Amino acid sequence: MTFILMVGLFVLGSCDKKNDPTPNPAEDEEVSLQINSISLQDWTVGSELKFEESWSLNLQHADGSSPITFLINPNSSPIPERIEVKKGTYRYSFESASAPTFSDYLPVKLAGEFEAETPNQPVNLTGVAKSKGIVIQLDYDSSPPKLAEPQLIDFYSLNSDYYLYYNTADLLKISIPLPESQGFLTQFHLGNTAPLSTRYQVAWPENNDFYENSIKLDENKWPLTLIPTTVSHLEESQNETSGLAWIAGNLFSINDGENTNEIHQIDPFSGEVVRSIEVANATNVDWEDLAQSSTHLFIGDFGNNMGNRKDLSIYKVLISDLLNQDAVQAEKISFNYPNQTDFSPNNMNHEFDCEAMVFQNDKLHLFTKNWVSESTDHYVLPSEKGNYTAEFLENLPLTGLLTAADLDPVSGQLILMGFRRLGSNPLEQWLWFYRGLSETHVQGEVRKTKIGIIPHRGFPEGIAFWEKGNIWISSERFVLEGVYNIPPQIGIVGLEGLF
């Protein structure tokens, strides 16, 4: 797909024509040319482009005569002046001298051929962009968005949009001002996998949370929708990735039931498994989530789709062993639910499945995946080895199936992640936010944000706070024969600036 920009040419000068002692009058007849458009291969965002102030466009006649160079202004549209050339076949070329890491203009390389045959001959130039572009569209008045990392740069303004051209594979962090506020949104953008052109649209105020790959803010400036950034696809061995933990600058993941009893260290930017650590004295019946204290990693073996398990457990591993050994030993915490009396198999039709857990103040907080009500029950357990009956604390009416949880180690913010199975827009991925977590209940009113749909991003499974309140998320493979085949992946959701 190409992007077509209507432009004109302004002729400032050319070299002399080649002398021919016996000219053919028909061949020497001149025609007037005007550039109609510039088409860039695979440039899809339909907004105005900004080029260098001038280009030196080279024209080479097929008869081998000396090239003609025209100095043109590619940003003017239209310009009435014409190029006068003799009839014939011409090759044209232009290439920007450099492609800066960040710039306010789009460097290009143009090449092609045209026939100069008729008066007022239209010419369409084609080429490729040498950099990529980001456009941010805000439907409210604001100061310019900023590139926050790896450099601090204001986005440039062009008509009603803000834009920046870049030539780097780095992960870019963008700060987008919230309306009438000192707060901001954080949007990540990965240079090496992003398309040539990307548009981020922010709408305010909105009450429609239908997911359209845009950011929608409600009247209180809370994001109804956010755009996750996929940073890698995971190896096939991680098709059933289920839980995440960020420890000492490393990302760890587990697979769920019927997989190995291993914790995997993942390179989030390549998706490769750096190493696998066996939990030698543990069995993976259905590992679902990870939680951590300052000294230990907890593995939740409490997946319970059928509702008939009597061996629910949590494994406790020393972080010092995890970071330095390829095989570790675990302590075991066994538990049951105080209100479960029926253990007959009841596939996905009960309230005793669990995929989410956090650690706080020597306690493990569990949040169930309630298949019937699409709410979650909040239980608490001691974090020491032993056999316990979990203590029921509260029910949270989320209207979704919960698959992961984590606590921000800095702010104490609690985030739950899951998806909606039912309703008018099924298979949506959601985040639920609480101000914090006490010993007996979650704190603050719930706020929620949609982050995508399963047919585009896979099943949401793991969540881990990264830095400055931003989060890693993982999704397991999603297959619908002949329709979808979404590989497992790691992504980032920018939350910095919201709290």
State each model region's role.
Residues 17-28, 71-78, 97-130, 178-212:
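Structured interaction patches on ligand/partner-binding surfaces of diverse proteins
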Residues 130, 134-182, 373, 377-400:
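Short helix-loop boundary/capping segments
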